[in-house]
């Protein structure tokens, strides 16, 4: 993959992707170190093992405010649904962005929803781990079930 010395993301409208965000190819890019002040990182997910990876051999530091940062995931909804179902209701990518211990990105958490798939991205000790789930249908059916039960109880009391 590509190799760079230092990645500095600082523009609020800046977008970075390991491959061009519209190429439909997943790839890896490696940097010695980097910092994230603002802007968006786009991760392309092609498969369970084929997805964009950003590797920092050294530290990856948060130098700005999380409100100016964003993560975006690009994937095929049908495939993502398959990955989630095949993995017991959630699909996790554990090494999307890797870095050295002691990086100030550690502890940063992003949450979002892409095409109906909820995701949580957690920057841990040495890597970003992203978990995808499909919360909506289960929550909706639980609410409908509770509503039907409540109506049945009310009718029985009459």
Please identify what each model-predicted range represents:
Residues 136-154:
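A short, hydrophobic C-terminal helix/tail in secreted or cell-surface proteins
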Residues 1-90:
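Extracellular beta-strand/loop-rich repeat segments of large surface/secreted proteins
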Residues 51-52, 93, 139-142:
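Intrinsically disordered, low-complexity segments enriched in glycine/proline and serine/threonine
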Residues 40, 46, 63-134, 147:
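Extracellular/surface-exposed low-complexity segments
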Residues 5, 27, 55, 115-117, ...:
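Residue-level detector of intrinsically disordered/flexible regions characterized by low predicted structural confidence
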Residues 3, 16, 20, 28-29, ...:
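Short stretches within intrinsically disordered, low-complexity N-terminal or propeptide regions
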């Amino acid at each position: 993959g590509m190799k760079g010395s230092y990645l500095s993301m600082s523009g609020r409208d800046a977008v970075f992707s390991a491959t061009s965000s519209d190429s439909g190819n997943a790839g890896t890019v490696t940097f010695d170190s980097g910092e994230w002040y603002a802007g968006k990182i786009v991760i392309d997910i092609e498969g369970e093992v084929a997805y964009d990876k950003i590797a920092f051999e050294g530290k990856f530091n948060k130098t700005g405010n999380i409100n100016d940062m964003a993560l975006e995931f690009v994937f095929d909804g049908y495939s993502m649904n398959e990955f989630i179902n095949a993995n017991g209701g959630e699909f996790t990518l554990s090494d999307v962005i890797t870095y050295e211990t002691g990086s100030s990105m550690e502890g940063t958490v992003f949450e979002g929803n892409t095409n109906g798939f909820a995701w949580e991205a957690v920057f841990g000790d040495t890597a970003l781990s992203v978990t995808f789930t499909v919360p909506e249908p289960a929550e909706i059916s639980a609410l409908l079930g509770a509503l039907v039960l409540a109506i049945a109880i009310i009718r029985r009391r009459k």
